[in-house]
Design a protein with these regions (language model features):
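A structural signal for isolated positions on well-ordered beta-strands in alpha/beta enzyme cores
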Residues: 7-9, 87-89, 124, 144, ...
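Conserved N-terminal Rossmann-fold NAD(P) cofactor-binding segment
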Residues: 5-57, 70, 74, 78-79
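Rossmann-like NAD(P)(H) cofactor-binding subdomain of soluble oxidoreductases
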Residues: 55, 59-138, 153-156
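Gly/Ala-rich phosphate-binding loop of Rossmann-like dinucleotide-binding domains
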Residues: 1-3
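A short helix-to-beta-strand connector/capping loop
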Residues: 33-45, 84, 118-122, 163-165
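Short loop/edge segments at beta-strand edges and connector loops
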Residues: 45-47, 125-127, 169-171
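Internal alpha-helical scaffold of NAD(P)-dependent oxidoreductase catalytic cores
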Residues: 79, 115-122, 140-178
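Cofactor-binding loop segments of dinucleotide-utilizing enzymes, especially the Rossmann-like FAD-
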Residues: 13, 93, 148
């Protein structure tokens, strides 16, 4: 996104405040990726979550653990109940069990948001392979952006596509997730 002139804000969860402080003290060198995060990418502690999500945003990218799905559903529903929820792009893969059936995590998030009063959700997913270290170092990779609505998938794919991060799109959300 940065290479396509989009503003990027990264907001950590409440569990990542110490990590964010260390990152900033270390001149934005990410310890796990061993690469510098560009100054144009703004990194915030969770205390800025509400303020940033209430600004004019086109896309919320969710890079949370599978155990954090309920938490993020709580946070999003708290802010967007009765409002339009921006497009979501979920990086998290996996399955959950609901009423003795397997459910994709994108479906779980949608169910939780609807249960919490978000009438309209628009959740996309990305299928790789693409590793964070490769992306941070601009290693060529190819991904598929999937959404039940092909136009949304195409819009997000075009937003993210660069000369090293190659995107295609699909309306087969379940197929890309599995």
């Amino acid at each position: 996104c940065l290479d396509n002139n989009h503003d990027i804000n990264i907001v950590g969860t409440h569990l990542e405040n110490d990590f964010i402080e260390k990152l900033k003290k270390n001149k934005n060198i990410h310890p796990g990726l061993n690469t510098e995060i560009p100054d144009q990418i703004k990194i915030f502690k969770f205390e800025k979550f509400d303020e940033l999500l209430n600004s004019n945003i086109d896309l919320i990218v969710l890079g949370i653990s599978s155990k954090g799905i309920e938490w993020v559903a709580d946070q999003l529903s708290r802010l967007f109940k009765g409002k339009n929820l921006p497009n979501l792009l979920m990086l998290t893969k996996g399955l959950s069990i609901h009423k003795n059936n397997y459910e994709l995590l994108v479906d779980k998030l949608e169910r939780l948001l609807v249960d919490k009063g978000i009438a309209k959700t628009n959740i996309s997913a990305v299928g790789g392979p693409c590793l964070a270290a490769g992306l941070a170092n601009k290693v060529h990779s190819s991904v598929v952006i999937a959404n039940k609505d092909i136009n949304t998938a195409k819009k997000i794919a075009n937003m993210l596509n660069t000369n090293y991060y190659h995107t295609s799109y699909s309306d087969d959300l379940n197929g890309v997730e599995v």
